[in-house]
Amino acid sequence: MAKQLIQSEEEFKRIAEQEGVFVFLKHSTTCPISQAAFHEFDAFANQHEDVPAYYLQVQEARPLSNFIAETYGVKHESPQIFIIQNGEVKWHTSHSQITEAAIEQHLS
């Protein structure tokens, strides 16, 4: 599965209610650190097409970003990545800690 842009709470809720695991990235389109994190996320998604991968652009979907922070009790940061499994945050991190290797490590 290719990575998919999510823009609404309804889309996110539909994904989060499903069984299994998925990766979710919140990023800024104007921040160089965020662009580097997106590159790592993109590399992961391209190498692991069996793992659903979603993202949002904070500037265009701030209400969704806030909803995710409130739902999971994780303070908003950007960039920020989550591994969510069966409705629970299995792992999250932000900024330069977002690497393809880190995502792979925490997925297993």
Swiss-Prot record:
GO molecular function terms noted in the UniProt entry: enzyme binding; oxidoreductase activity; translation elongation factor binding
Gene Ontology annotations of biological process type: cell redox homeostasis; response to oxidative stress
Function of the protein: S-bacillithiolation is the formation of mixed disulfide bonds between protein thiols and the general thiol reductant bacillithiol (BSH) under oxidative stress. BSH is an equivalent of glutathione (GSH) in Firmicutes. This protein is a monothiol bacilliredoxin, which debacillithiolates (removes BSH) the S-bacillithiolated glyceraldehyde-3-phosphate dehydrogenases (GAPDHs) GapA and GapB in vivo and probably a number of other oxidized cytosolic proteins. Debacillithiolates the S-bacillithiolated Bdr (Bdr-SSB) and BrxB (BrxB-SSB) in vitro.
One Pfam family matching this protein: BrxC
Listed name of the protein: Monothiol bacilliredoxin BrxC
Domain of life: Bacteria
SUPFAM superfamilies: Thioredoxin-like
Post-translational modification: Cys can react with bacillithiol (BSH) to form mixed disulfides. S-bacillithiolation protects Cys residues against overoxidation by acting as a redox switch in response to oxidative stress.
Quaternary data: Interacts with AbrB, BdhA, Bdr, BrxB, FolD, GapA, GapB, GatA, PfkA, PyrAA, PyrAB, PyrE, PyrG, PyrH, RpsB, RpsK, RpsL, SalA, SucC, Tuf and YtsJ.
Description of the deletion phenotype: Cells lacking the operon including this gene (ytxGH-brxC) have increased S-bacillithiolation of glyceraldehyde-3-phosphate dehydrogenases (GAPDHs) GapA and GapB in cells with increased basal levels of oxidative stress due to concomitant deletion of genes encoding for catalase (katA) and alkyl hydroperoxide reductase (ahpCF).
Transmembrane segments: none
PTM sites of type S-bacillithiol cysteine disulfide: C31
